[in-house]
Amino acid sequence: MAPALIFDLDGTLIDSAPAIHKVSNDVLRARGYAPLGLDQIRSFVGQGAPHLVRCLLTTAGEDPEGPLFDAIYADLVSRYETDVEGNTLYPGVITALQRLREMGCPMAITTNKPYKPALAAIAHVGLTDYFQLVIGGDSLPTRKPNPEMVNEARRVLRRPHALYIGDSEIDAQTAQNAGLPFVIYTEGYRKTPLDALPHAAKFHDFSALPGIVEGWTWS
């Protein structure tokens, strides 16, 4: 029986940093703060919208837990849902997902991005029909690296075996916490050297992913 595949979103299936960069700077400019560079914004991505807002506030010289947090968070999430043009697929994603679906792999996305913005980004890049389930950063009481999202995805997908596919330090820890093999996409938002992150397999081109899954040996 083909395994369940549980994917991260940002930095794994889609390059969302340009979209997040634009939305974040729109929020900052609306309040008179200086815009930030793409690399700096990219370094804030992966731990959810609350973390991103705290980073923006800190960089702007404001209290990250202060009275501005709620308003900026609400503005950011609202813009996230409609300003999706900067989200793009990594090369080869659609072809790989088509092959994985043909192999009988049920698939889910677990992301720290809020649920509605995640759905909007997924729809924009044409991924909606490939996934049985999407769990966002505000869908459950916890976010990754807590394994609750992944455990819920496994419950819904109902397969005895599963792989977790992501790109970052958070993803490596999530897979470890969930007790799943971690397959890392090396072209995402990882900051740590690859050899320093525990992983069971790696790929830099999505054309390799179906072969990795098909050849997996389960102990």
Curated annotation (Swiss-Prot):
It catalyses: 2-phosphoglycolate + H2O = glycolate + phosphate. Its cofactor is Mg(2+). The keyword DNA damage does not apply. Its EC number is 3.1.3.18. One of its GO terms (molecular function) is metal ion binding. Mg(2+) binds at residues 8, 10, 167. Keywords: Calvin cycle, Carbohydrate metabolism, Hydrolase, Magnesium, Metal-binding. One of its GO terms (biological process) is DNA repair. Pathway: Organic acid metabolism; glycolate biosynthesis; glycolate from 2-phosphoglycolate: step 1/1. The keyword Metal-binding applies. The active site is at residue 8. It comes from the Bacteria. GO terms for cellular component: cytosol. Specifically catalyzes the dephosphorylation of 2-phosphoglycolate. Is involved in the dissimilation of the intracellular 2-phosphoglycolate formed during the DNA repair of 3'-phosphoglycolate ends, a major class of DNA lesions induced by oxidative stress. HAMAP family: GPH_hydrolase_bact (MF_00495). Belongs to the HAD-like hydrolase superfamily. CbbY/CbbZ/Gph/YieH family. This is Phosphoglycolate phosphatase.
